[in-house]
Amino acid sequence: MPSSKARSSPSVDRRERLTLAKLASYDDVATDALVDCAYFWTKTRKNRTKYIPVRGLAEDTVAHILLHDVIVAKDVSAAERKILDLIGMKRYLAKLPNDREKDWFRKHLRKYIQMYLPDCPFEVTTTNRYTITEHEAAICARKFIPQGQEIKYLSGTLVPMTKEEERDLDLKRKDFSIVMSSRRKTPSFFLGPARFANHDCSANGRLVTRGSEGMQVVATRDIYIGEEITVSYGEDYFGIDNCECLCLSCERVPRNGWSQNLAPGPQSKPSTPEPKASEDHLTPRKRKAQSDIDSDSSPSSTPRKRGKFTPRGSKLRSQLSLTEDIAISIESEPRVPSSNLALSAQEAGDSGKSSSAGDNVESSGTDSESLTSITPQESQRSSASTAATSVFDEAVSLNTRPTKSAVTTAAPAESSIAAEAPLSTTIPETDIKLEVEPSCEPTTTVTAQLDTTVRADSCVSDISSSTKLEDGSEALEHVKKPRKPRTKRVYLTIEPESKLNRVPGDYTKTPKLLAHSYDRWVDCHTCNAWFVQQNSYLTRRECPRCERHSMLYGFRWPKTEKEGPNDDEERVMDHRTIHRFLYPEEEALVSRRGRGVSFGLTPTPELSDMRSETPDSEALDERGNTRVTRRRTRAIRVTTV
């Protein structure tokens, strides 16, 4: 007798159930082979973000199978075998582990093949109503569908989602393939041809389940040719009460996502407040004088306007003038011994601190105050000093703004001062020591002002390394360029509180889609819908949907086969024999005014204006016929001569 544990084990069918990952993989391959590779003008969105298209699939090969086996012969099984015999599909089918998964893939692939049967009342198209710049898939009716009728071949496969799959799925991304079952009260993943049906608050279709893993779309009202087939995703799918919905019904009212244009949008606020305490560390400007600070102590609530542009002087000119001033000051000073000459920067630093409260730093009195007497012990420690070093380290204040460019101009200034070193060799020798106090306060000297966040130890190391001299010569070593300190800067990031305000019809005849010079908005001569033609040196006759339909079926949209025994129109089996551009006579009848400058106010093809002809179209027609007659007469004259 078998144990209870063996009896309670699940069956093979239940263990090998169709999962979300498997169904998503099947759907990506099926849409790649039978939608993207069937003369489709864009790429459909895949379920896996890192999906790689199947190699070995050619558009002409797939279209040939669909035309001869599905459209003409109406043999879905033969078309399925030929498609699976393609190199890329055969390679993918061989990777499936068992026969059960291969059977699941064949069933799912057959749903996409049936879309191309002549009796199918719909076809896949695109719309840019929701994103303007990107076209998303949609379902368009090409036959009249009465109310209550089940839309043929508009079906899909339904897979229940587990708790783990719900956590792994990125719910922040609006995935329109997730449906909530009203009977099971659980979310399910829904893929197949019906997944291309978009949402509408007044939808003309309804999703109904067929069996445990099937789903179908039923028409809730009459659907006419050219109308988009839509379903309802739920009451709160696009926010609370669908407040962000951009469907056609909301666009006509307008409401929800289209109602933002009625009132001005809220102003965006910065996500991080402006730094108040660290303003002195981040801004390179000097502090104001004490009187100005007292008068302007209350901070302004609004940001200040940017001042007018003031031309700055040349950096090279300022460096040359700096060198001349230093040379003149050296010659005017009393001669001192050049063996042990040094300067004290103590008082110069103090004067720099006191002068930092004003707008400009004055240079009066700094030369005489910086020379101080020192003790013999201090003179022994400064025996390595030379006249050139003391001249360079002399505290000379400048009327310059402490900008970031001051650090970069320090090296050229030092080289220019070093060139004046022979002038300082005649100075008499005295025991004067160079005393440098590591002050990090904002001061303006010859070596340029450092940032306020420089550490004291880095200041001492940089200045001490710059004052070392060679023992055997009196040449000045190149002063080490001060390191730029690493400061933490606060960058304000502005996050808009609301999305772009949408205006009804802003996705039609908008200049946002005209990326190149010769991109134009063109009116389709078959369905009267506006579309963007890139590089329109020659104007196309039909939109991408109508052109794809004629390439696959051999008839003009929405015709798929002969309408009866009295129909004499023959199917075009080779689409390359059709001229798909306007003739010069037809080009003269079309007005080029407003083809991308502004967008229309009517968003849908059935409500849009007719073909963009000029008011005097009859007169232009006669002129065109006259031009054609003249050309023919001229050609006859040439041949007779």
UniProtKB/Swiss-Prot annotation:
Region of interest (Disordered), ranges: 261-388, 596-628
Gene name tied to this protein: set9
Record field: catalytic activity: L-lysyl(20)-[histone H4] + 3 S-adenosyl-L-methionine = N(6),N(6),N(6)-trimethyl-L-lysyl(20)-[histone H4] + 3 S-adenosyl-L-homocysteine + 3 H(+)
Residues annotated as domain SET: 120-234
Entry protein name: Histone-lysine N-methyltransferase set9
Keyword rRNA-binding found: no
Chief subcellular location: nucleus
Signal peptide interval: none
